[in-house]
Design a protein with these regions (language model features):
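Solvent-exposed, well-ordered amphipathic alpha-helical segments
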Residues: 13, 50-51, 61, 90, ...
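Short linear capping/connector segments at secondary-structure termini
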Residues: 1-2, 52
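Soluble non-cytosolic domains of exported or imported proteins
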Residues: 7-15, 56-63
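Short tight loops/turns at secondary-structure junctions
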Residues: 30-59, 66-69
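Solvent-exposed, charged/polar functional surfaces in cytosolic regulatory/catalytic domains
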Residues: 16, 20-24
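Short, positively biased Gly/Pro-containing turn/loop motifs at secondary-structure boundaries
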Residues: 3-8, 23-31, 66-97
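Residue-identity detector for threonine
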Residues: 2, 15, 35-36, 40, ...
Length: 97
């Protein structure tokens, strides 16, 4: 799992976010591919605007990251030192055999 969050201030927040999403993601599917998702985290930690940015080419692989993000639903509020009201995240879900 890799992600792009530009120049985000707080690496510990990112670590916790990845851990929370990974707990809901079914990583082993017997196929190889990468699905890229984009979503927004609101100031209160709510995950919104979940969408597929790039398909793996396999619906079974593409549906799992969305499911993981929906199940995660919310995270800790964005850190006080982060100045924006939202954080846009581009996350790759990498499936390997």
């Amino acid at each position: 799992m890799t992600l792009d969050v530009a120049d985000f201030c707080c690496p510990e927040y990112i670590t916790e976010m990845v851990d929370r999403v990974k707990r809901s993601w079914i990583e082993r599917q017997g196929l190889v591919g990468v699905t890229t998702m984009v979503f927004t985290i609101r100031r209160d930690g709510t995950i919104v605007d979940i969408r597929r940015e790039k398909s793996s080419g396999f619906e079974v692989l593409d549906s799992q990251p969305e499911r993981a993000l929906v199940l995660t639903r919310s995270l800790a509020p964005l850190p006080a030192q982060f100045p924006n009201q939202t954080l846009t995240v581009h996350m790759e879900f990498d499936y390997q055999r």
